[in-house]
Amino acid sequence: VHEWDLGAMEPLVARPHSPDNKDTAHNCRDVKVDRAYIGSCTGGKITDMIFAANILKGRRVKAPTFVVPGSTEVHADMLNLNLKGEAKKPGEKSVYETLQDAGCNIGPSGCAACLGGPADTFGRLNEPMTCISTTNRNFPGRMGHKDAGVYLASPLTVAASALTGKITDPREYVSEPIATGSAGVA
């Protein structure tokens, strides 16, 4: 049996150009990000979107932020669920609306920039820039330009970093636990 003190654990990022290149978000706090990317299969589940929306609620992103739901089901849930992962009631904002209000660019579900693609791919890095992303790989050229630097992080860390324009520990923006209801539970 292993016991972990989750309160003592720090959010991690993977520096370019390998998922194994681990560091804490705190140690990377001076890294400016030109773009934030939330989504694809790894960071595009409905719970990921709920976490990001709770960080971004009532705020505006500083770094251009691209959101790609991991499936059409997640996209539909983003439109129909509130920030607690429950069915949206009249007058409540949906996860989608919250992300949109924060200034995020929301695309269709799919891989999008996670695997680069042609120059017009949604969220693709077409020039050397620094991106913080919820995707699962950060090898040179993976999200587009071979000289782009991609940091991998959780949806919470990516959302917090989108707000500040630099890699940011999301605990600065979370004051209470984020509930996801039964969202994402099959």
Residue spans for each PLM region:
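Fe-S-dependent hydro-lyases/dehydratases of central metabolism
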Residues: V1-A186
